């Protein structure tokens, strides 16, 4: 079999394949023989159908098409093997199948073209001496006080209050019923449109403005138990229920009771109730250590992201469609798994109509991820960076001990750990051979917001789903 190769865009190899007359005839005859054994033709037993009857009944074009399918499949497979091509994904026929049917004659040579994806060639123009900026996240001691105060709020005892009006910080017990406020030009005599789910009895609302839709809490402040009044409010935009987003509303509110919070003292007893520590001092120290490490980890992550972003700029690679599609598949699978773990019906979110949009909008991120991965692999190859079996086993043992009750696929865990350790080593090497300038938190975010990449449809679905479950 004669095979001619050519290099095509997107890391493809084009193949011109010429199949010998002997093979085209032999395959055609074999197809006729196989069909005669399987086709039911009245008046003839299977395997005893005369050749001419079979040709008349099925038609020569049908038989040629069946033979051609075998010739193409076998021809491509043999060509890849003959030329020692490390193909990835499924080969693609470049010639028109209809044209091939018309030109194919058993006993004559058959020439057609196909293409296969191969691993891309990576040109890493620069990977040492990279320069980038990353935001430094500094530990804020005030976070410890904020966490402790939040715990106090959650452990607060509600004490009924009499003889005064409701004020910010109280907990109000109310009955309410809401309607959509009429806009200018609406029929004044029409019945107000009730808000779906916009009524409740004995509803406890904490009088903090961020605890309800804007205007609702402000309207309750100043009311006395027993008072009923109309409170104007407005649904935010965006809002979980898009039909209500941005619409003004009127709530008829009856204040039934006022309660105020009695907070526990911040002492050792409090520390023992909310944690495993015996003293408040020990709890504070633990929280401080946690948030210091969190700040350090975030700073390191920012450095890594800045480094990888800079590395990608110096990678020249023509990605094959097979790798991009595979990466998109992985991204959507990860998104589906996360949503499923949240208890959401993935089938309702990932409809047949939206999946093509998801795939298309996920491509830019898939390409970015592939470039990062291939870039790191190339650095490891050039600098002979590797992980040892001992390093892998140590990390695996550590993880298994952390989750003694989990049913762990140890072989798969080995693979995951090996990849993670290798990535860590490569990134550490790159950091040591690059300059990442740390800048104040927020200074880069403002610049990036001016050039914001559109979020993927999968991210949109996740945000919407999280908002729905959070209400």
From Swiss-Prot:
Point to the regions of Low complexity compositional bias: 448-471
Primary subcellular site in the record, as a coarse category: cytoplasm
What's a GO biological-process term for it?
Answer: protein transport
PPIase FKBP-type domain boundaries: 169-264
**Highest rank taxon of the organism:** Bacteria
- EC number of the protein: 5.2.1.8
Pfam families, A to Z: FKBP_C (PF00254), Trigger_C (PF05698), Trigger_N (PF05697)
UniProt-recorded Gene Ontology molecular function terms: peptidyl-prolyl cis-trans isomerase activity; protein folding chaperone; ribosome binding
Q: Which UniProt keywords apply?
A: Cell cycle, Cell division, Chaperone, Cytoplasm, Isomerase, Rotamase
User: GO CC terms for this protein?
Assistant: cytoplasm
The record's comment about this protein's domains reads: Consists of 3 domains; the N-terminus binds the ribosome, the middle domain has PPIase activity, while the C-terminus has intrinsic chaperone activity on its own.
Record's function text? Involved in protein export. Acts as a chaperone by maintaining the newly synthesized protein in an open conformation. Functions as a peptidyl-prolyl cis-trans isomerase.
**Entry protein name:** Trigger factor
């Amino acid at each position: 079999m004669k095979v001619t190769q050519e290099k095509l865009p997107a890391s493809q190899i084009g193949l011109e394949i010429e199949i010998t007359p002997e093979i085209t005839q032999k395959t055609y005859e074999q197809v006729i023989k196989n069909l005669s054994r399987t086709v039911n033709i009245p008046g003839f037993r299977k395997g005893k159908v005369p050749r001419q009857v079979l040709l008349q009944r099925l038609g020569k074009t049908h038989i040629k098409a069946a033979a051609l399918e075998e010739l193409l499949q076998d021809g491509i497979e043999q060509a890849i093997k003959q030329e020692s091509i490390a193909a990835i994904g499924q080969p693609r026929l470049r010639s028109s199948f209809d044209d091939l049917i018309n030109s194919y004659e058993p006993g004559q040579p058959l020439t057609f073209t196909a293409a296969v994806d191969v691993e891309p060639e990576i040109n890493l123009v620069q990977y040492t001496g990279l320069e980038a900026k990353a935001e430094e996240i500094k530990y804020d001691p005030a976070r410890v006080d904020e966490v402790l105060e939040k715990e106090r709020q959650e452990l607060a005892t509600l004490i009924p209050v009499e003889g005064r009006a409701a004020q910010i910080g109280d907990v109000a017990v109310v009955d309410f019923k809401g309607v959509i406020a009429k806009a200018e030009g609406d029929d004044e005599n029409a019945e107000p449109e009730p808000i779906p789910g916009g009524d409740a009895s004995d509803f406890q609302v904490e009088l903090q403005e961020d605890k309800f839709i804007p205007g609702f809490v402000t309207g309750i402040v100043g009311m006395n138990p027993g008072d009923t009044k109309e409170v104007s409010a407005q649904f935010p935009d965006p809002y979980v229920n898009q039909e209500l987003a941005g619409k003004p509303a009127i709530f008829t509110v009856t204040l039934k009771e006022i309660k105020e919070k009695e907070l526990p003292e911040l002492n050792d007893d409090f520390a023992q109730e909310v944690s495993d520590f015996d003293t408040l001092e020990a709890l504070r120290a633990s929280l401080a250590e946690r948030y210091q490490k969190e700040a350090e980890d975030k700073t390191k992550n920012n450095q890594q992201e800045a480094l990888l972003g800079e590395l990608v700029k110096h990678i020249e690679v023509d990605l094959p469609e097979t790798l991009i599609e595979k990466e998109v598949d992985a991204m959507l699978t990860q998104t589906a798994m996360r949503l499923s773990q949240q208890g959401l019906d993935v089938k309702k979110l990932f409809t047949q109509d939206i999946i093509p949009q998801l795939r298309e909008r996920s491509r830019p991120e898939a390409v970015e991820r592939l470039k990062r991965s291939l870039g790191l692999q190339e650095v490891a190859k050039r600098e002979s960076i590797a992980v040892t079996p001992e390093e892998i086993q140590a990390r695996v043992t550590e993880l298994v001990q952390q989750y003694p009750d989990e049913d762990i696929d140890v072989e798969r865990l080995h693979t995951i750990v090996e990849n993670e350790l290798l990535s860590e080593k490569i990134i550490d090497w790159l950091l040591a051979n690059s300059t990442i300038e740390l800048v104040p938190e927020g200074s880069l975010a403002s610049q990036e917001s001016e050039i914001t990449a559109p979020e993927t449809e999968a991210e949109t679905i996740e945000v919407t789903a999280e908002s729905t479950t959070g209400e």
